[in-house]
Regions:
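Carbohydrate-interacting regions of secretory-pathway proteins
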Residues: 1-347
Length: 347
């Protein structure tokens, strides 16, 4: 069972009990994706899906397991429960669990006693699921995990996130090239102009270290991007030449969206790997969210809350510049952008 809303930062409290030994858990920042590796040329309807994300464990088949933190379909146990928290558990009775997820800091409590904590940013938002795994049936009788008094405090995204788009006009932005950028129904719409060439909509302000996020919806096939540390020179024929690092945005499934490409210089900074959870996280024909964090030489990107790449650049060429939305040659149908934010007071 899952909550049909995604949560990033939150506090969740609930009670649970198991009348028979069983494995269950509370999954959070979770995504429903194909099981990896996906066979080459596999069709979506032929793929087998499962959950990817974090889990606060409920495990009563062994003594010390409830309250630990796991990564489902990934690294396994990330933190075991503390001895003090396990002692608070009541066998066959109701137990209280609390989960705090604020940025990369995740804590699990049992009866207000800290059970496990991690600092991890592989998943920064996703769904919440209640899980039961009946791997063994006792005397042909069903086993279950019971949940009650489920309460969640949605904290949104902690921090001073400042909007770069006012939802009304393109104040604070500048158009480079012949492509058309307009505001329609509160979103930025980029479409091919008469030359069907390459164009950019760039912020007037520049950044060095930053964390930014934006939602996009592709209107068709093509190639797009979210650039940072950028500058643009115009050729005599009016064609814009950008110097910057591109966070790729493209409609493939699997997708290369979120991987890093340095235009006109080194190309792919990391060769895209399409056998990762993030490569299957794109939602075709729907809104998606890209996020990028850059501090010094280190850049991290996420697609729909799943980490795509973490890259330490050994020889960066660019250290400051503006953000730019790209409409590349071939993206004739266009792209829409909204909810563009940058985090002030980055730590």
């Amino acid at each position: 069972m899952y909550e049909k809303k995604e949560f990033a930062d939150f506090e969740l409290e609930l009670e649970f009990r198991t009348l028979r030994p069983i494995n269950g858990g509370v999954q959070f920042r979770t995504h429903w994706l194909p099981i990896l590796p996906v066979p080459e040329n596999a069709k979506p309807e032929d793929m087998v899906y499962d959950c990817y994300g974090y889990q606060a464990n409920i495990e009563t088949r062994v003594k010390k397991a409830t309250g630990g933190i796991m990564e489902e379909n990934g690294r396994g146990y990330l933190a075991e429960p503390s001895d003090e928290s396990v002692k608070t558990l009541t066998q066959k009775g109701w137990n209280r669990m609390k989960i705090e997820a604020i940025g990369p800091k995740i804590k699990v409590y049992l009866h207000d006693v800290l059970s496990a904590e991690i600092e991890d940013d592989k998943f920064i938002k996703g769904y919440i699921l209640l899980q039961v795994r009946a791997d063994e049936v006792i005397k042909d009788e069903p086993v279950s995990v019971e949940y009650r008094n489920i309460r969640i405090k949605d904290l949104g995204r902690i921090g001073n996130w400042v909007s770069l788009f006012n939802g009304t006009n393109l104040d604070g932005w500048k158009n480079y090239g012949s492509e058309e950028w307009t505001v329609e129904n509160g979103v930025i719409v980029g479409k091919s102009g008469p030359k069907k060439s390459e164009g950019y909509l760039a912020t007037e302000k520049t950044w060095k270290d930053f964390r930014a996020r934006a939602k996009f919806k592709m209107l068709g096939e093509g190639n797009y991007g979210f650039f940072y540390h950028s500058s643009i020179k115009m050729r005599e024929d009016g064609y814009p030449i950008i110097s910057g690092v591109q966070v790729e945005v493209e409609p493939g499934y699997p997708t290369k969206t979120g991987w890093l490409y340095e235009s006109y210089k080194r190309g792919w900074l990391v060769e895209p790997n399409t056998q990762t959870p993030a490569s299957w996280a794109l939602r075709p024909n729907d809104w998606n969210e890209i996020e990028v964090k850059c501090i010094g030489n280190k850049t991290t990107t996420w697609l729909n809350g799943i980490k795509v790449v973490e890259f330490d650049d050994p020889s960066p060429n660019l250290f400051e510049g503006f953000f730019a939305l790209q409409l590349h040659t071939g993206g004739a149908a266009g792209i829409m952008w909204k909810d563009i934010f940058v985090l002030e007071e980055l730590k």
